[in-house]
């Protein structure tokens, strides 16, 4: 797949590393993103899966949706386990032991396992320079355990632990910017993606895994169950997230920012918010606050990409 053109579907391999027949909810954007991500890769991959939706709906014994070596970890230690696998292979090579050539290690987790519970292990693995890829499949709450808020839940969203009511607008804090946190570790590759832009997603995952050293990919994964939205609008919701600036698509390659989608003008965030039940309680004033915040953050991102503010930073290379 090294030379495939991401805009030519017929050149993509037919092989699937993630099978159908899993137990995801109807319209699950995470399952779609998962399939796309691993379809971009060959079969020389070891998958390290943090506890969460992906682990639950893909691996209930005696069944499995994985055609790859796969290990289930705790919520908090997927990056640590991935680090150990990578270091173990390195030690085996030093001792002259037989090791499969070009084996890749990919850790995956949801937004809770990434931005909250597993943040320390991820930060450590990125800082140490382990040669692995971490992919966050972000559905913006702890969906597996009952739609509880996480630090990746958007401002104003209603969840079971940030309910909307007379004295609450829902989520009270702004979404944690995990891609920027990853980029702050000066690693070679960081990217954002969404299943609604499938070939962009596949290209970025392939690029991340082929990068020498640590790489981080953050994928927005629409969750109709938790977002209280129609199951047939999953692709539309992902596109609107990008087109409104709520979830911009970009790469950070060796410190240099690059926008992935050219948007001459952002669509109003209301177009995105109004099709999700978790935002139906928001007043016009709160929506204006969200609009202002999105425009400010998007402009900052454009300036980084335009001026190469980050290009002078020296990215860490893999050990």
What are these regions (language model features)?
Residues 54-55, 139-144, 224-226:
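Short gly/pro/ser/thr-enriched loop/turn and capping motifs at secondary-structure boundaries
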Residues 221-319:
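Flexible, low-complexity linker and terminal segments
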Residues 9-13, 101, 151-207:
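Conserved thiamine diphosphate
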Residues 212-214, 247:
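Active-site lining segments that contact anionic ligands and/or coordinate catalytic metals
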Residues 136, 191-193, 216-220:
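Short, conserved beta-strand edge motifs with alternating hydrophobic and charged residues
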Residues 2-134, 147-157, 171:
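Cofactor-binding active-site loop characterized by glycine-rich and histidine/acidic residues
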Residues 15, 27-31, 75-79, 172, ...:
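Electropositive phosphate-/nucleotide-binding environments in soluble metabolic enzymes
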Residues 148-155, 198, 205-212, 229-240:
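Short, surface-exposed, charged loop/turn segments at secondary-structure junctions
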């Amino acid at each position: 797949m090294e030379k495939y053109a991401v805009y030519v579907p017929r050149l993509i391999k037919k092989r699937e590393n993630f099978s159908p027949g899993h137990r995801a909810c109807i319209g699950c954007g995470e399952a779609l993103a998962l399939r796309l991500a691993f379809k971009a890769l060959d079969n020389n991959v070891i998958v390290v899966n943090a506890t969460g939706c992906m682990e639950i709906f893909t691996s209930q014994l005696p069944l499995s949706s994985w055609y790859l070596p796969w290990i289930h970890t705790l919520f908090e230690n997927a990056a640590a386990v991935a680090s150990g696998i990578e270091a173990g292979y390195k030690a085996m090579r030093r001792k002259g032991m037989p090791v499969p050539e070009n084996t890749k290690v990919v850790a995956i987790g949801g937004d809770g396992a990434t931005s909250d519970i597993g943040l320390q292990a991820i930060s450590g693995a990125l800082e140490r320079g382990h040669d692995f890829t971490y992919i966050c499949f972000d559905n913006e709450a702890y969906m597996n355990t009952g739609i509880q808020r996480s630090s990746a839940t958007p401002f104003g969203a209603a969840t079971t632990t940030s309910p909307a009511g007379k004295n609450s607008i829902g989520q009270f804090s702004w979404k944690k910017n995990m891609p920027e946190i990853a980029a702050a570790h000066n690693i070679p590759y960081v990217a954002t993606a969404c299943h609604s832009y499938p070939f962009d997603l596949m290209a970025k995952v392939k690029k991340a895994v082929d990068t020498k050293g640590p790489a981080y990919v953050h994928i927005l994964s629409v969750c109709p169950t938790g977002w209280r939205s129609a199951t047939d609008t999953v692709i539309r919701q992902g596109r609107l997230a990008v087109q409104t600036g709520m979830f911009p698509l970009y790469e950070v390659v060796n410190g240099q920012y690059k926008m992935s989608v050219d948007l001459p003008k952002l669509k109003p965030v209301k177009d995105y918010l109004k099709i999700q039940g978790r935002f139906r309680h928001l007043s016009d004033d709160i929506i204006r606050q969200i609009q202002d915040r999105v425009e400010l953050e998007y402009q900052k991102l454009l300036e980084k990409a335009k001026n190469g503010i980050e290009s002078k930073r020296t990215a860490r290379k893999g050990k």
